[in-house]
Amino acid sequence: MLGAEPGRVLSIQSHVVSGYVGNRAATFPLQTLGYDVDVVNTVQFSNHTGYGYTNGHKTTPEQLAAIFEGLATNGLITHSRVLTGYVPGAAALQVVGEQIEKMKKDNPDCIYVLDPVMGDVGTGLYVSPDVVPIYKDMLRLATVITPNQFEVEYVTEFPVRADDRLLSGVKIDSLATLHAALIQLHTEHSLPHIAFSSIPLPISVVSTLSLPAPPHQYDRLLPTPHPPWFNAVGVGAPDEDVLVCFASSFVDGQLDTWAFALPTIDGYFSGVGDLFSAMVLAHFHPAQTSPLPALPHAVSKALLAVQQILLRTHLYSLSHAGPSGAATPRPLHAAPESVIPTDAELDSAVPLNPKDPRRKAKRMRIRELRVVQERALISQDGVGWPGQRLNWSALLA
C-alpha cells in the first residue's frame, strides 16, 4: 500500500443520477476545496425518495467487498480522510465498518467523519432496525460524528423517564439532557468530537446562551424586509424552538462545547446533512488551535457555506415556481408579498394542470441544493458562522 495522501478522501454513501444528496452533495464541494475524492456508492438511484417515485438498486455487501478488495490489491487505499453516509442494510454497513477498521489500523491518523444516517424527526427510522447496533459499534472508529436530533436520541442508550413512561435513549429537550447525551457519547464510545447538526430548543433556553446573530455574509442575501417564510434567530414566543448546532470535543476529561444559533427557513430540502458532513470533513484540521479549536472551526466554516446555499436554493425555488409548478421567474429579491407561499402550500395547491403526473417532481427539482451554481460560497475565504463556547458549570448550576 502506498503512503496516506493528505488530500485524498474516500466517500461512502448514496448516489443519485439527478439531484444533490449523498455523494452528489459531497463530492463537488470537496473537490472545490481541493480534495481528491474517491467515491463508493451504496445505492444507485434515479433521484432521492422525496420525489415520491424513484428507481434503481442497492449495492450488495458482496459488491462493496469486491470494490474494497480491488482497491486494496492495487494499493489504492491511500486515503487520509473518510466520510460515510447512507448505507441501507446491516450486512452492507458491516462490510463498510470492517473496511474503516482496517484503514484506521493501517493509519491511526486517518480522519473519519461518520454521519449515522438512520432517520429524522417526523419521519422516523428509514433504515432497517438491525443497522442501529452496527452504527453504535462504529462510533468508536470515528473522529467526528454528525448526527441529527433523531439519530442522537436513537444511539444514546441509558433510559430516561418522561410522563411515567420509560423511554429508550435521551430525549434532548433541555441543556441538561443535551449535556447528558454528550457525556455518554464521549465517554462510553470514546468519541473525541461530536457535531450535532441541528437541535431544536425553546427560545427561552437558547436566549440564556447569548449566541451571536447570523453573519453579514448571510444577511446580505436576504430580501428586505424579512419575508414570512424566514424565522430570524430568537424571534418568537418563549416556547417556540430555535435550531442550534452544537460542536463538542472531549479535552482532558472535560467537555468543550460550542453552540451556533441557526435561522429557520420554512421549506423542504434534501441533502443538507450530507453537505454539512462533507464541509465539516473538509475544514477539520486536528492541529489547529487558533482562532478556534479544530472542531468549532470546521463547524463554523461548514455552517456558513451550508446556510448560504440553503437560503439561495430557497430563494431560487420561490422565484421559479408558482402553485402550478410551472416556471414563473421572479427576481431573487422580490417583495415579500410575492413569495409568501410555503413549500407545503405550493405542494398542496390545486394545480392548473391536474393531469400532470410530474408536478411534484418539478417542485422537487427546483429545490435541489444549488451546490454548483453557488460554488463561490463553498470556496469563500474569511470567517465562518459565529458561535459561542458554553460554560457548562454555570449553565447547569
Predicted features and spans:
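Short pre-catalytic strand/loop immediately N-terminal to key active-site residues, enriched for Gly-Thr
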Residues: 17-18, 256-271
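Conserved phosphate/ATP/ADP-binding segment of small-molecule kinases
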Residues: 127-255, 265, 284-296, 304
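Non-cysteine beta-strand/loop elements that form the S-adenosyl-L-methionine
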Residues: 38-42, 111-115, 139-150
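Glycine-rich, highly charged phosphate/nucleotide-binding loops
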Residues: 55-74
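A short helix->loop->beta-strand "cap" motif at the edges of active sites that frequently abuts
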Residues: 103-112, 121, 189-192
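Charged C-terminal helix
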Residues: 290-397
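Short, small-residue alpha-helix embedded
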Residues: 268-290
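Glycine-rich phosphate/adenosyl-contacting loop at the front of the ribokinase-like
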Residues: 1-59, 379, 385-397
